[in-house]
């Protein structure tokens, strides 16, 4: 499986033949393999990648990077793989592992919108806007009184909105700029500009 870590730069458009295609530009890599995990030692197979050089790290992490033979890195993310032996600790992973036309799964973190009410968070209709109503943007009924005398788990209520992990499946790579470590992906990608994204080859592609 191919995978890399990147940052969303923003959206633009490119011409493919006679069509205009909206794309999201991602600065992907270079990443380094910091650690390998196997079923024998950890109970599962995975590879840990590091991205972006860090100015300062604590002593334990300094030892981890020294053991891997790489400079201290800011972002560490783990990817499940079937065969970790295909990777070497300290190996550099660049954007050239992908090709134009490849299908990929992209994971990002949606924009955080803070504490939001039910109308904004869930699209509730709200109450009447006039004629003596005092029920404008309220939630409405959340359950019964005496039985079960509690609110069921999962009830749509006000709370933290956004800042959730979101994965877009089967996105298509439209263009790759190997020199500048850039990928142009068809359509939108979750998160704000500068947000972290995890890219891996499509599972269902």
Curated annotation (Swiss-Prot):
Gene3D superfamilies with a match to the protein in the record: 3.30.160.810, Translation factors (2.40.30.10)
Keywords: Ribonucleoprotein, Ribosomal protein, RNA-binding, rRNA-binding
Record's GO cellular component terms: cytosolic large ribosomal subunit
Top-rank lineage group of the source organism: Bacteria
PROSITE patterns: RIBOSOMAL_L3
Family to which this protein belongs: Belongs to the universal ribosomal protein uL3 family.
Protein name (record): Large ribosomal subunit protein uL3
